[in-house]
Amino acid sequence: MEMVGKIACFVVLCMVVVAPHAEALSCGQVQSGLAPCLPYLQGRGPLGSCCGGVKGLLGAAKSLSDRKTACTCLKSAANAIKGIDMGKAAGLPGACGVNIPYKISPSTDCSKVQ
């Protein structure tokens, strides 16, 4: 019986050691998730399906590293994409009924994201 316990312990240990780690959030995921928001942020369309992307991003950014990545990607997009209404960008989480731990803005300090 003692041998069975050792084998079971070894099997569990192997499962923990080789368990797949969740993929880290990428800028590509952030951008594709929020692509439906672009017309709204540029004043060319309604909020529409944008909130699904915002909520999906919030759900995907579970770790501190993911939240900082999302912040950095959003900050870069806010700087790179022309015609974004920064007021709408900053108000996007509230308009979608979610709370994110930083402001969507080119001036956000993503190193302070918690």
Swiss-Prot record:
Protein name: Non-specific lipid-transfer protein 2
Gene Ontology molecular function, alphabetical: lipid binding
Signal peptide stretch: 1-23
Key words of the record: Disulfide bond, Lipid-binding, Signal, Transport
Gene3D superfamilies linked to this entry: Plant lipid-transfer and hydrophobic proteins (1.10.110.10)
Job of this protein: Plant non-specific lipid-transfer proteins transfer phospholipids as well as galactolipids across membranes. May play a role in wax or cutin deposition in the cell walls of expanding epidermal cells and certain secretory tissues.
SS bond list: 27-73, 37-50, 51-96, 71-110
Organism field: Nicotiana tabacum (Common tobacco)
Domain of life: Eukaryota
Family indicated by similarity: Belongs to the plant LTP family.
Record has S-adenosyl-L-methionine as a keyword: no
InterPro entries: Bifun_inhib/LTP/seed_sf (IPR036312), Bifunc_inhib/LTP/seed_store (IPR016140), Plant_nsLTP (IPR000528)
GO biological process, one term: lipid transport
